[in-house]
A protein has these predicted regions:
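Sensory/regulatory domains in signal-transduction proteins
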Residues: 5, 36-38, 283
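Short Gly/Pro-enriched turn/cap motifs at secondary-structure boundaries
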Residues: 6-10, 43, 91-98
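Short beta-strand-initiation
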Residues: 12-15, 48-50, 64, 97-99
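Internal glycine-rich alpha/beta core junctions
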Residues: 21-29, 71-334
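A short core secondary-structure module
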Residues: 27-84
Length: 335
């Protein structure tokens, strides 16, 4: 449970849920200080028995930053004292997933609730890091890289499925002709209309390049996840690029496809009713617009310091040009 109501698209940058260590009882006190700090968009919020909650930790009056706590949400099917949840309401898509808000009212957690692989509070109330030179939230944020690759793949999979279903419809849809062809040939099909035929071909070419790039990012990230290492700057940039590029490419192609198939796009079985899924992808694991601004800022900062921006001339930069390159997508950088 990371996202908070007030944070909006700055999820992860804004976290006001509080966890204070009570040395007298050797417990953490988890609290939502105001409504804007309530956890929001929490999947399985109505069914989960346990949750990993991100909260700003204070030990001995000193703030030590965001940390993760494993806690019981429910015991015996009932919410634990101090925890309240609510329905976020009907969404435009994904209503099979129960997204809830969660509020904590001075919920007490044992000292063992702190996920302490990288930092801990001992029985005397002393805070100490266990992993040198890496803030605990950086290790938590490591999972964002996995999420960005997964979001990119999800957007590409949705696009592929929508195009597959729509192509099958278009190939079976006759286009009325003013007169029969002298040869007796069957009526032309919707898929043969030039603009639709061109869009199908364009989509295959563009998607193949983006999919190749995302796949390379996954291949480079996987061994780092196994060892717990953080990606280098070039791979971080490439993964962010992959997420933005995959989602924006899918949005562009799917929206254009919708314009070409008329009232078919209004049918519930067509798949177009779930186009807002791509909006979910746009905002998940880092809003694409903010993520793009961050990438630009980081590269300008490197340039201002006289350093070659991450990736040089660069694999990540190349991903932004993959639609104009005749060869396959640029390889994802190694560490």
């Amino acid at each position: 449970a990371l996202t908070e109501r007030l944070a909006g698209v700055q999820s992860g940058l804004v976290g006001e849920t509080q966890a204070s260590y009570d040395a007298a009882t050797k417990e953490f006190v988890l609290d939502t200080p105001h409504e804007g700090a309530a956890k929001n968009w929490i999947s399985q919020g109505f069914t989960a028995d346990k949750a990993v909650v991100l909260a700003a930790l204070t030990v001995g009056g000193q703030s030590v930053g965001p940390h993760a706590f494993l806690m019981d949400l429910r015991r015996g099917g009932e919410l634990v004292p101090g925890v309240s949840v609510g329905d976020m309401g009907i969404k435009t898509t994904g209503n099979d997933l129960d997204n809830a808000w969660i509020h904590f009212d001075k919920v007490r957690l044992p000292r063992s609730a702190l996920l302490n692989a990288h930092a801990d509070v001992d029985e005397h109330g002393t805070y100490a890091r266990r992993t040198a030179d890496i803030a605990p939230f950086e290790m938590i944020g490591q999972r964002l890289y996995t999420g960005r690759v997964a979001v990119a793949q999800a957007a590409l999979a949705y696009r592929a499925q929508l195009f597959e279903v729509t192509r099958a419809y278009a190939e079976g849809k006759p286009v009325p002709a003013p007169r029969a062809h002298p040869s007796g040939a069957p009526s032309p099909r919707l898929s043969g209309i030039p603009q639709l035929r061109h869009l199908f071909a364009e989509a295959e070419e563009r998607a193949a390049k983006v999919e190749a790039f995302v796949g390379r990012c996954e291949d480079r990230l996987t061994p780092l996840l196994r060892t717990g290492e953080l990606p280098g700057a070039a791979l971080t940039q490439a993964i962010a690029t992959a997420k933005v590029k995959a989602v924006e490419t899918s949005i562009d192609l799917c929206w254009r496809l919708k314009q070409e198939v008329g009232s078919y796009a209004l049918m519930g079985s067509s798949g177009f009713k779930h186009l807002d899924f791509l909006n979910c992808c746009k905002f998940a694991e880092g809003d694409s617009r903010i993520l793009s601004q961050k990438m630009a800022r980081d590269r300008m900062a490197d340039f201002a310091k006289g350093r070659t921006p991450a990736g040089g001339s660069s694999e990540a930069e190349g991903a932004g040009r993959i639609e104009r390159r005749p060869a396959e997508a640029a390889p994802c950088p190694a560490r």
